[in-house]
Amino acid sequence: MEALTELCDIIAKNPKQFSEKLAWICGRCPQTEWLLAESPRVSRSHLNAVLAVARIISKNPESIDNRAKSVVNEFLSAIPASFRRSFWPHSFPSQLISSFYCDFLSYLSCAADLSPEFGTEVARFTGEVVIAAIAPSSGDSDGDPAISKAFLVALSQHFPSILQSDGDKLITMLLDQFVLNRAPASPKEQRQQNSANSETDTSSSQGSPISTNRYPSGKTEMASPGDEVASHGSNLSSKSSSSVVMNGGSIVWKSGVDQLSFGFSEGSGGANPVFRQQVASFEDESIESLEKQEIAFRLITHILDKVKIDSKLQDQVRFIAKRQLQSMSAFLKSRKRDWNEQGQVLKTRVNAKLSVYQAAAKMKIKSLVSLETDGKTSKRLVLETLALLLDAADACLTSVWRKMKACEELFDSLLSGIAKIAVARGGQPLRVLLIRLKPLVLAVCALPDQGAMLESIFKTSCVIIESAWAKDRAPVDNFIMGLASSIRERNDYEEQVDREKQVPAVQLNVIRLLADLNVAVKKPEVADMILPLFIESLEEGDASTPSFLRLQLLDAVSRIATLGFDKSYRETVVLMTRSYLSKLSSVGSVESKTSAPEATTERVETLPAGFLTIASGLMDTKLRSDYRHRLLSLCSDVGLAAESKSGGSGVDFLGPLLPAVAEICSDFDPTMDVEPSLLKLFRNLWFYIALFGLAPPIVKTPTPPLKSTSNSVNSVGSMSATALQAVGGPYMWDNQWALAVQRIAQGTPPLVVSSVKWLEDELELNALHNPGSRRGNGNEKVASTQRLALSTALGGRVDVAAMNTISGVKATYLLAVAFLEIIRFISNGGILNGESSVSASRSAFSCVFEYLKTPNLTPAVSQCLTAIVHRAFETAVSWLEDRISLTGKDARNRELTTYAHACFLIKSMSQRDEHVRDISVNLLTQLRDKFPQVLWHSSCLDSLLFSVHDNTPSTVVNDPAWTAAVRSLYQKVVREWIIISLSYAPCTSQGLLQDKLCKANTWQRAQTTTDVVSLLSEIKIGTGKNELWSGIRTANIPAVMAAAAAASGANLKVSEAFNLEVLGTGVVSATVKCNHAGEIAGMRRLYNSIGGFQSGSTPSGFGGGLQRLISGAFSQAPQPEDDSFNEMLIARFVRLLQQFVNTAEKGGEVEKSQFRETCSQATALLLSNLGGESKTNVEGFSQLLRLLCWCPAYISTPDAMETGIFIWTWLVSAAPQLVSLVLAELVDAWIWTIDTKRGLFASDVRYSGPAAKLRPHLSPGEPEDPPESDPVDQIVAHRLWLGFLIDRFEVVRHNSAEQLLLLGRMLQRSTDLEWCFTRHPAAAGTFFSLMLLGLKFCSCQTQGNMQKFRSGLQLLEDRIYRTSLGWFAHQPEWYDVNIPNFCHSEALSVSVFVHFLSNELSESSQSDSKGKPRESGNLIDVTDQYHPVWGEMDNYTLGKEKRKQLLLMLCQHEADRLDVWAQPISSKDSPYSRLKISSEKWTEYAKTAFSVDPRIALSVASRFPANASVKSEVTQLVQTNIVDLRTIPEALPYFVTPKNVEENSVLLQQLPHWAACSITQALEFLTPAYKGHPRVMAYVLRVLESYPPERVTFFMPQLVQSLRYDDGRLVEGYLLRATQRSDIFAHILIWHLQGEDVQETPKDGSIDKNAAFQEILPQVRQHIIDGFSPNALDMFTREFDFFDKVTSISGVLFPLPKEERRAGIRRELEKIEMQGDDLYLPTAPNKLVRGIRVDSGIPLQSAAKVPIMITFNVIDRDGDHSDVKPQACIFKVGDDCRQDVLALQVISLLRDIFQAAGLNLYLFPYGVLPTGAERGIIEVVPNTRSRSQMGETTDGGLYEIFQQDYGPVGSTTFETARENFLISSAGYAVASLLLQPKDRHNGNLLFDDVGRLVHIDFGFILETSPGGNMRFESAHFKLSHEMTQLLDPSGVMKSKTWHQFVSLCVKGYLAARRQMDGIISTVQMMLESGLPCFSRGDPIGNLRKRFHPEMSEREAAHFMIHVCTDAYNKWTTAGYDLIQYLQQGIEK
């Protein structure tokens, strides 16, 4: 319901905006037809909805639509139905029904009061509803009286509008049903009624109106109304039989109520039979009847207030009320013993009856409103009513029920009514009332326990006095004087000895009442009447001697003095001061020893309290100043007088005055000019405070032992101990005094009396001592004591011996200074009294430094004063550190205090005295190091940059030396300040600097701007080594530096030599910001001028308006006419930003410059309105701010994020008040990216980079569609964003726990136990930067402001460690991003994390070695428990250390890997490249990793493949916990081994449950080593079947070879099933089966196996064909026939002469017809054949057959079918193509690996397919020519050819071609290294039309080479001289292009090494194929060796560099080209 209530209030504020919400709520209300049903029943939701609508209307009835109002009115009209229980929901309690009625009617009545129109609508239904409640219809038997009563009770509290015509009817019914519906009246009662009616000249419409009480007929006879009041005037002035004794006399007055003919008096009630009958009649009334009467009276009162009723009916109401009031006195005079009922029953009855009387009194008062003011009858009725009310009030005072709350409320109502009548009528009623009121007041004051009655009397008196003061002053004066004179009347107890104790309570209460009246009415005339009487009593009367009366009068006069009336104030202060000094003068006298206790109370409590009361109440500035002077003078007099007294009189008399002094000094500004006389009084006060030890201790350390005192003088010894205790504690006096001293310190000016001669003369200081005092100047031991105390107070900074030249009084004086200046900082951190804002001028250092400025100080004194400054600073730091855990307003005050001190110290650096400047710099440096947040506070930076000019005293401007010294000092400090701030938070620092540049520019002060520019021009920030800072500074984190570049606004991309010039970018960005601010200001002016608004709202000038905007606040609020301008621009910017978001979500590209401009303008608009008070567009600005924070996150591109960081920095720099809002929105947006899986949190597999792209060939898992956009862009955006957040963390970590908690929320959500990060390798740096932020955040647990979150931070730290380890749960990958210096930044990011982690570990080990554990709480030393992060654990502390060590090792390795990737050709070795780790440590690492996550252990083994210890331990762990690893395919090699297969291990039983692995891994299990184990085979086939057949087709040669070992025909079964799923798979398989039909020369032992293999091939082929469906068979027939015909052309051409062969090809091609449009190229199934170019046939040269090249017209199967392209193919007959297929398979895998790693390397694995025995189809590489062909047309080498083809060296086309040649050469270099292709003559090297190299013809690979394997080509790849000319223009391997080539080779080789097993498995499966490449040596073993798995990444990089160097222009390469030229004529 609370949420619904909040929603209602929001809707009520803006019903138009939330009209849909309102309509929805109205729809939840019960509908009209429902309410009109015969027996409606509502639900709880109905009732809540009705209340909600009613509440909304009550808030804003004029703006709510009619639908809502009609809903409420319809429900109101249906309320009669609610009187039935069936109307309400089931089990709906009565309390809730009452609550509903009350809430509903309160909303309804409120709305009706606010809107007369709505009230009229409500009034139409109110009468009928009330009538139904009063008198339910006789036919409604289901009605529940309790419900209707609950409604009437609620109605009596909240009565809505009614119609005029309903008034009489309702009152008549109420009287009939609830008041007059009784037994018939007796004849006597009838006569009484008639008599009353005749007396008032009225006649009742009722039959027989009777008393409001239910009297049985004939039981009670009452006097007629005519007899009750004989004369109203005489009644009001007559005497009462009762009397109140007052000071020996009596005040006698008679109440009219006593004239009622009850016939009893005080004390005789129980014996009088008439009274007993009266009580009996009261008891006869039921409680229900009383409740009904109360309801009726209250309702009638409401009706009388709403409408005008019939006069006769009104008379009847008045009569009924009168009879109630008449009976009230009798009721109140009853005693408990008169009642038969007792206990709770009686209490309930009395409460009910009193409530009836209260309602009747209010009804009586309301009934008088309609009377004519001047009518005779009216006056008589008014007097009569006053008499009745006063009589009733008097009866309340004497009633035994007086203490009951109901009686007190009745008394209050009576007096309120009396006051209301008297004030309204005035004249005689007022005068008569004041006569009667005085005895009533005295009677109340005479009561021993007045309770609330005295408060009621006080309120009534105030109302009457204030209202009658101007109308009729005389009776008011008489009333006041009568009360005041009553306190002077002598009492009757003179004969008693101890008369002071017998002061009547009435006197004390009257005094208090009169004082309260004075304070309340605030009239000097009243004070002048009363105060003289009080003072006279105090000086001459009974109160002149100690007594309770005197104490009360002193309190009263002090309260009167607070009113600030000059005369009364001065008289009072003089009296109290004289009284206080008189007490001091009597100390030690005989009289003081026998004085009354009240005398002590007066001195200790009353007078000090009075002084404090005056100090608190005085408001007039002049009087406060006078009172301050008087109080300080009193303290000085008291101190001097008490100093000569024995004992502790100084403490006793000065101490009680301190709270008053503190209060009167609370508003005194100590920095203003103070008169010397007042300053001396302050000095005297502190002198005595120090002397008497009244100040709180200022030293926390134990006081040193006393050495200089002697036992020979006891008093001196005691005094020395007291002095030392005063310094070191404990405090011996009242704690309130200590607090008062602290407050006094805040308002005390520096105790520097003279600017010329600082220390006062000895005589003047000695005058503070009494000449005869034991503390006189001549007592050297006393002086020694004071010096010792001073030394202690200074913390031992000044030795006692160095103070010998300081006299005793000077030591006391310096001790007073020390107390004062240190206490300033103890109390509130050193903020002085003054203006509300905390600024440098309010820093207490402004006082401390005053002592240092005085010339001619002696060395000893100067040393002491300097020590005081340092002690004050230490105290300030301690105060700030103690409050570091505060939050909210307290934290804000603490920060403002820090900044105020920093600003003052900055400004003090311009002081003329060098000593002061040095101290300022020293303290400022300490403060900055302790509280780094000052670095980024705007006021501190303002002071730094501009104070050197602002604070230059005009008198010394002409001193060049001083000016130069100060400027030099400022420049040094500013430079250091800015460099440090940039090193921690470069974003925020730059934002602030840009802000200050704008500010300096607007000031138009050339010197200021020049100095700032000269300072900034020398400062640069950048990544890498920086001489400005070292260690782990935030600026060393690449993400932060990238964000800093964005924040600078320079739009820079991080480059290798990234170096951000602070000045240049700052000026540019400041100019941009100023321009945007100017645009907004200009638009505003133009808009206002066009709109005809007042010109006064226009800013006075561009510069001034701009300055206000940049500083973040306007000096004056925007005028209302600006609201429409703001609304228009807000709507525009919101619309534009939403459009950008929509564009991004639809996949469109957001235009960078437009987005940046829009965001900047929106930010300028937002900032321009910050200082305004207008709340019109708050929601709009909130929405705009939210969009500015969220848009970059939505768009998620680096450009958008750069813009975001720029504007966020602008916002937080120019508007610190928005920082929390901005950060909260950014954290929400960050969490949104987690929920929506974006960027860094794109945890879906398809965003994981290489792992996803290599599926399923080299990585396990189903292949998925690639992401729509490059995930790296979003990762880079997150990286920039994270840099900004780290920057903000550094700024807020020390001063804002709230913002830290926001970051903590972000980190907690980011480190959920369920992995939510992307696996993309390009995210490594960003990921570890986030983890670094997390660890930095957790290190805050040692900070005071995060102590209470310590346990939570420890858990978060564990989550961060687990998340960090989670990064290593997958195999390491590489990724190359086409962003300058990105890889270097990634490596550096991990290195910084490693650095932080290693430092944390070293700190941990150091603390452990010292026996001081770093952690506390219940999270350490836990054994055998479940940890929320780590799960089951044995020992938390030990396990945590092991996990940290593991993480550090893995991160070191990752940093090394990334460093190699970033700097592949670097010759340096990483410090982590060769970790010296023992085998035991490796084993422990493996165990720890496995305990966290088994995948981490597998990753460790993968990262260190040559480490036997790790492999052995991981193997054991996998096999031991194998059941838990079923989802991890990478674990397969650790239990599916040839050994386990041989032993048929039980571990293999897990394979049916194991997750699918990659295809290459599955292929490995098909090799003979695994012996075709059934479980292994079943797993392999399940894996293959889990992938689409099209994906498996790539490995068709390997699958065909696996048939050799397929004894169980399992592979064959898979192949047949796959052919059913894919026709293309079937066709490719058939072609490969046909290609294997090769007659090999049998070798020993192999003939049987090969024969069996050859035998099965045609069988499988036939089974496939037999399994074809008709359509599939048709497709198969057409496809194969078509290409068989093309292939057969070669046989036709063979007999023909060469010159006729081309024509023959054309003839044969013309014979071939296309059979369908679904034929495809066998080498590229995705290309559909659309025809043959018959004139394209070319016969090729060949020794045996006639290969032909034919060009087809093809289209892309999945592309545009109208886009027909040529594709040439070579059809070979007589050549075995299978070896080319294998080589190109490896090249294809390498290409995929390179692409997955983002490497810019080029390979072209053209298509080759064997279609039969020694037959095949080979795709022609398009747009290429061989190097030999190029040589046939050009004489020069490649370098010259490239210039001819692509233009001169240096041209764009040439360099592009060179780049293409480079990337292709590097790609084939890696492929050549692995495959070892030979016969690399220029005929086998192709170049395409853009300069790329392509290798063809792989007849010699692996271990084979031409010339009988002579291995003449010894280089790993061909890099001839002409190739080096292109790759290395320098010729000495020093050029940039050569380094690029080598770098790409290294990266390609490193990427290939990651997939070594997959490549080797692919080749190994072909081992038995009979291919020539396997004919000699150990091809598989040597292939593995070329990967060098035993090498680290850096070693592998060095190896590849060596390979490149070795191949560089190797002579064997040139020699082979020469041989080929000589033998084959191939151009070299």
UniProtKB/Swiss-Prot annotation:
Explain the consequences of disrupting this gene: Lethal.
Q: According to the lineage, what is the superkingdom?
A: Eukaryota
| Annotated stretches, region: Disordered | 184-241
Q: How does it sit in the membrane?
A: Peripheral membrane protein
- Give TM segment ranges: none
Question: Region annotation Activation loop: residue ranges?
Answer: 1895-1920
What does the record say about activity regulation? Repressed by PtdIns4P, adenosine and wortmannin, but stimulated by other negatively charged lipids such as PtdIns3P, PtdOH, and phosphatidyl-serine (PtdSer).
Where does it primarily localize? Answer: membrane
Q: Which GO terms describe its molecular function?
A: 1-phosphatidylinositol 4-kinase activity; actin filament binding; lipid kinase activity; phosphatidic acid binding; phosphatidylinositol-4,5-bisphosphate binding; phosphatidylinositol-4-phosphate binding
What InterPro entries is this protein classified in?
ARM-type_fold, Kinase-like_dom_sf, PI3/4_kinase_cat_dom, PI3/4_kinase_cat_sf, PI3/4_kinase_CS, PI3K_accessory_dom, PI3K_accessory_sf, PI4K_N
Task: Please list the residue ranges annotated as the PI3K/PI4K catalytic domain.
Answer: 1734-2012
Region annotated Catalytic loop sits at 1876-1884
Q: Which GO terms describe its biological process?
A: phosphatidylinositol phosphate biosynthetic process; pollen development; protein phosphorylation; regulation of shoot system development; root development
Q: Where is the composition biased (Low complexity)?
A: 231-241
Which Pfam families does this one have?
A: PI3_PI4_kinase (PF00454), PI3Ka (PF00613), PI4K_N (PF19274)
Ranges of compositional bias, category Polar residues = 192-215
EC number of the protein? 2.7.1.67
Q: Has the keyword Membrane been applied to this entry?
A: yes
The PIK helical domain extends over: 1483-1659
Q: Where in the cell is it found?
A: Membrane; Cytoplasm, Perinuclear region
Protein family according to the UniProt entry:
Belongs to the PI3/PI4-kinase family. Type III PI4K subfamily.
Its biological purpose is as follows:
Acts on phosphatidylinositol (PtdIns) in the first committed step in the production of the second messenger inositol-1,4,5,-trisphosphate. Can bind to phosphatidylinositol 4-monophosphate (PI-4-P or PtdIns4P), phosphatidylinositol 4,5-bisphosphate (PI-4,5-P2 or PtdIns4,5P2), and phosphatidic acid (PtdOH), but not to 3-phosphoinositides. May function upstream of the cold response phosphoinositide-dependent phospholipase C (PI-PLC) pathway.
Q: How does it assemble?
A: Interacts in vitro with actin filaments via its PH domain.
This chain belongs to which protein, by name? Answer: Phosphatidylinositol 4-kinase alpha 1
Organism, by scientific name, is Arabidopsis thaliana (Mouse-ear cress)
Which gene is this protein's source? PI4KA1
